[in-house]
């Protein structure tokens, strides 16, 4: 069957519906998701972003080395209409500042290992900062929006 997907969001929602009970990915102990579970985690994160004023078409930074939750972060952004701003782990503090400032990013997913490289003045502007490692909230700013 041929599909004419126009967006990653369409692919995501189709896959969650069609393959719900199948494994989406497996990574070591405790990080195994069926498509259903993967979709649930992404929806919860998306709702968390919405609760902090991150709406469709808003930009969300993604600054993390490769890890299983990188894909969770990515799809919690793009599958619900937001725009991902991916950043290379080799970027300097000034480059991180420039990218997040010029993109007008309102939220950030960042690994705990790289968190200290994000300039404080940028962190203060973020509505919410989420760790890609365990998807915990590292910082939330109700007054940012």
Where are these regions (language model features)?
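Short, flexible loop segments at the rims of nucleotide/cofactor-binding pockets, characterized by
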Residues: 1-4, 37, 84-87
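Conserved AMP-binding/adenylate-forming core of the ANL superfamily
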Residues: 4-5, 13, 21-67, 71-75, ...
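Short recognition helix of helix-turn-helix/winged-helix DNA-binding domains
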Residues: 8
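Structural core segment of the AMP-binding/adenylate-forming
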Residues: 52, 79-145
């Amino acid at each position: 069957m041929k599909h004419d997907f126009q967006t990653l969001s369409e692919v995501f929602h189709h896959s969650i519906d069609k393959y719900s009970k199948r494994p989406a990915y497996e990574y070591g102990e405790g990080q195994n998701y069926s498509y259903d579970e993967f979709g649930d985690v992404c929806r919860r994160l998306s709702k968390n972003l919405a609760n902090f004023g991150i709406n469709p078409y808003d930009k969300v930074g993604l600054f993390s080395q490769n890890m299983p939750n990188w894909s969770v972060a990515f799809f919690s952004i793009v599958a619900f209409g937001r725009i991902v701003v991916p950043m290379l782990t080799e970027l300097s503090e000034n480059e991180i500042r420039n990218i997040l400032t010029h993109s007008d990013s309102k939220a950030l997913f960042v690994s705990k290992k790289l968190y200290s490289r994000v300039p404080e003045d940028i962190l203060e502007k973020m509505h919410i900062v989420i760790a890609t490692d365990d998807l915990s909230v590292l910082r939330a700013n109700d007054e940012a929006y």
